[in-house]
Structures are given as structure tokens and as C-alpha cells.
């Protein structure tokens, strides 16, 4: 992994690379958190997004979505991934799971979970 100590970060995460880089200083602490930490943080971020939407603050809601992406990236960090592996996983998942299958995915969530 490229860190501040051994060189500049790469750009494998495109526009999300700055989110990854911003959290690099807390890498060790993040990797030591229990999985339940991330679940709770996601719940908090969704609550905050809903509050922004309830007060017609779309920009605030958009920032909370960016925070959700940040949490997802830190989950990938927690799982031991670096930006290059995340980029490859995302490309692979999009191609092999999502492309031409999004309607079926939505149907699955509706039929199995009622959402």
C-alpha cells in the first residue's frame, strides 16, 4: 500500500481517491474497529441525510452520501484492500454482477425484503 511515508497515493479510485487519502492518517485505527462500528456509522449517516432532506437541504443530503461512500471505502480498507484492488473489484462487480442485471437485482430486493 502506498502511504504518506513511502510515496504519493495513486488515483485508482478516481474522484473518490481524495476520500481514501483523507482517511489514510487513521488507517490503523480504522482497521482495528469492529464491523459493528461501520454498521452504526452508516445508520447515523442515513439519519443525517434524512434530516437534511426533511429540511429541504439537498446539498447537505449530498454531502451525507459522500460520507456514506467514505464509510464504504473504509470498510474496504478494513477488509485489507488498497485503492488498486478496490478499483479492480468495482470494475469486476459492475461487469459480472450488475451490467444488464439491475432490474433483476431490484426485483430480488422487492421480492425477498419488500424494499
Predicted regions span which residues?
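Flexible "arm" and connector segments at domain edges
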Residues: 1-65, 69-115
Amino acid at each position: 500500500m502506498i502511504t504518506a511515508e513511502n510515496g504519493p497515493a495513486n488515483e485508482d479510485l478516481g474522484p473518490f481517491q481524495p476520500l481514501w487519502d483523507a482517511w489514510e492518517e487513521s488507517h490503523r485505527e480504522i482497521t482495528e474497529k469492529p464491523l459493528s462500528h461501520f454498521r452504526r456509522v452508516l445508520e447515523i449517516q442515513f439519519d443525517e441525510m434524512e434530516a437534511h432532506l426533511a429540511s429541504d437541504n439537498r446539498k447537505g443530503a449530498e454531502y451525507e452520501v459522500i460520507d456514506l461512500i467514505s464509510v464504504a471505502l473504509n470498510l474496504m480498507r478494513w477488509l485489507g484492500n488498497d485503492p488498486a484492488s478496490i478499483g479492480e473489484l468495482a470494475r469486476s462487480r459492475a461487469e459480472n454482477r450488475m451490467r444488464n442485471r439491475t432490474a433483476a437485482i431490484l426485483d430480488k430486493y422487492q421480492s425477498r425484503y419488500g424494499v
